[in-house]
Amino acid sequence: MTRTLSWLLAALLVSPALAAPLPVTPTPQAKLLAPPAQPVPQPRQAQYPAGTLPLAGLGLKLVGNAPELGWAARDLRAEWQTRLGLKLTDGGSKSVTIGTLSDAALAAKVKAANLKAEGPEGYALLVDASGAYVVGATPRGAYLGVQTLRQLLTPQGLRFARISDAPALTERIGMLYLDQYSKGVNDRMIPLLAALKYNKVLIMSNYVQWDVAKSGGWAHPGGASKAEARRVADLARSYGLEPIPLIETLGHTGWMFYGDKNLDLRQDPDSQNPYAYDTLNPATYERVVFPVLKEAIEVFQPKVVHIGHDEVRNRDRFPARDNGRALGFEKLFVDDTVKLYSFLKAQNVGTMMWHDAAFSDSVVATLPAKLPKDIQVAYWSYGTSDGVEPLKKIRALGFPVLGASWKDPENPERLAKAAAAAGGGMIQTRWHGYFGNPSVWDGQAEQGVAYVRAANAFWNPQAPTLKNAPALYRDLYQPGSFLPVAGQTVSLKAVANRTLADKGGEGWIGKGPDTDLAALGQGVKRLGSYTFDLSGAVMTRGERAAVSELPERVTLPLGGRKAAALAFLHATGWPGNDRVPVGRYEIKYMDGSRVTQPLEYGRHIRAWTEPLGVPGASNFSMVAAPAWTGQTRDGMDVGLSVLEWTNPKPGVGIESVTLVSEGLGANPILLGLTLLGGQ
């Protein structure tokens, strides 16, 4: 009865006849993006003395003319403009000086500061009252040092720092894709990877619209053009990232059979969805594989090509043809690998491949001995194994080795330690289908977040695991200003129908004090980049018994207040199905017009029990910003997100916002509302 009365009272309070505008409180920092507390990747030797170098009179000084120094200046100027709306000009009464140890004065400065810059990617960084100095052992080191300096920028100036840094792993590779969405995504991913100090990119290139594919009728319309592939390679180089095209061969070769072409080259003649090619048919190489590799070399100008060669026998029969069965899998695999290796080597290009088919238990005693020892072998392991023994085993067999990690918590971190112990490098992979580039932000954002965690581990395997990787990823992919946005927090107390704490089974979702949201607290609080007035939950009806009697609609009267944007702190009570509409916000203006913001599960809103980063959780979106994570009393990880809605009519007053539920299992819950800008 108590629960029923509470929502009836809330309904009366917001009925058209009785509705009074909800109280608001002006705040000068309704939205405030804070600079990072510590650079990522974490430097291996760093001190941060108290103090800040003021921005007034600060200018840029480059010592040398290497391209990397120009890239460093570009990135630093972009940081000043994006974060503070300021121009970093040349000169100044004090300088941000960027150069290398080849300059005697800078070398002396590093020595006098008792810092060091060692190795091809090492740098020293000093910020004190006299200025800021980034000195690389090489121009490459200076460029990497500037990526650290960017993260010391605050609205007040550059934080004091004393850093001597160099990577533990010499190869730090991030994975990109070429599809029809390439430009919009890769133009963000490439600067992001550079800022995280990756030094190479593995570029999935199967479905590039190669000339030979277009003339043969097997070019996929979802693939990127050759011009786009070339542009991405050039862009990567301009950010210090060496491009490594990945052309999957032997297995995963559906690209060459698109449109039912080249079916005579199938390994398995009975396959309806060909997966591998016939290594004994010369036309496989003459018609398809060699022409594609030749074009890839022309486009990417690579030092190395990754030829795939993984999961060769996972689907179709292999060998499937009589002549192949007579020779056996091992000979077919070795002959194909050596053929591709020799083709690439003749053009001064190295070879990289995955480990699993060539180093499996069934063939490892014999097959690797037949392969050229300068093939780079990437050991992929996406689970809980630390990878130490497999990496050491591949290294002991004479091959340069890399680890390859994916998205699960601690996977990149564990494997990076193993790679460091084995003297290898690391690849951070991404697997979302060949034409799924946008999902790195919207749909499988957990794979994007993993780039941040991996970068930290690849540079400094001994660094602690990052706890704020989702927020860092969001900011790197979509950088924002450090300048505060004024606004107004809205008190929801008059319309709240559930308490956050559940002492007796009548609050939150009715499961008692061990499974409630008491950890969120009450009052005016900053959650992520936003400030909210927390006073209870506006919960809507859903299928579950605990919420089946709640209202389907709750209206929040705003009395004609204006805003440039609205920030909704929200969640659902229970999980739902991805991309299914579970509710909406209806915004009504004082002129009588209306706008609707849909709430698709997993995209705009998500269950409080599924925060980004929880093991096993997937299909995340960054459309809504991760804002808060905590734990229930029984130890369950929980979290909330913020959906920032841009107002298309900022000059018109908002009469009300109505939260509407579709009545499904995932019932929308509003916990905070803040008006950004406006009045």
Each model region followed by its residue ranges:
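Feature activates predominantly on carbohydrate-active enzymes
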Residues: 79, 118-332, 339, 343, ...
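Acidic, contiguous N-terminal accessory segments
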Residues: 19-164, 353-363, 373, 477-482, ...
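An acidic- and aromatic-residue-enriched active-site/binding cleft used to recognize and process polar
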Residues: 179, 206-208, 248-250, 310-312, ...
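Bacterial N-terminal signal peptides
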Residues: 6-16
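Positively charged n-region of N-terminal signal peptides that target proteins for export
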Residues: 1-4
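Substrate-binding groove of N-acetylhexosamine-processing glycoside hydrolases
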Residues: 39-42, 48, 118-121, 125, ...
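Flexible loop/turn segments at secondary-structure boundaries
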Residues: 181-183, 193, 208-212, 250-254, ...
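N-terminal/edge-of-domain interface segments
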Residues: 474-679
